Amino acid sequence: MGKRDQLKPKANVSSYIHFLLNYRNKFKEQQPNTYLGFKEFSRKCSEKWRSISKHEKAKYEALAKLDKARYQEEMMNYFGRRKKRRKRDPHAPRRPPSSFLLFCQDHYAQLKSENPSWSVVQVAKASGKMWSAKTDVDKQPYEQRAALLRAKYREELSVYRNQFNARKTCLQESATNQCREFEQAESDTTDGSN
């Protein structure tokens, strides 16, 4: 077991588990010489849990909430704050589909109409089997379409990057000019006050 695994926070437990631990301790105090097997003890606990009032259950639910908050806090410290995903630029060109995805797009409606009860996953698996069974000659039209779409994407991407770099340069220059103007205005006011 690694050092990091030893430091990992203990998982939070449910309200029922809090009740079970409390009930076990009380049972041991009241009947120290009595031994119950796991199955028997679990049955007794579940019967007792069903019989207690909502007010009593609320106490254990509060303990579970506190334990969950503790666990989340410790996990945040253990892993650190999660990094937010970088948002995708809506103006950036979208990546083109592969030859297999083009094949799937063409055959999805057909497979779905033949098998209306199939889920998306089942249709995708069937598409994968169909694609694997195809020969290289049969795959050629899809690969050509994918190559055309990739070439178009590369062109759009280079145009987008040029525009992005131009905007970035313009913003940097305008910020530099604003700084110069501010410094100039500041030096004019200090020179005028002397």
From Swiss-Prot:
Biological processes per GO annotation: regulation of transcription by RNA polymerase II
Gene3D superfamilies: High mobility group box domain (1.10.30.10)
Coiled-coil residue windows: none
Keywords: Chromosome, DNA-binding, Nucleus, Repeat
SMART domains found in the cross-reference section: HMG
Gene Ontology molecular function terms on file: DNA binding, bending
Subcellular compartments: Nucleus; Chromosome
Any one cellular-component term (Gene Ontology): chromosome
DNA-binding residue intervals: 9-79, 93-161
InterPro entries in alphabetical order: HMG_box_dom, HMG_box_dom_sf, HMGB
Family: Belongs to the HMGB family.
Protein name: High mobility group protein B4
Species per Swiss-Prot/TrEMBL record: Bos taurus
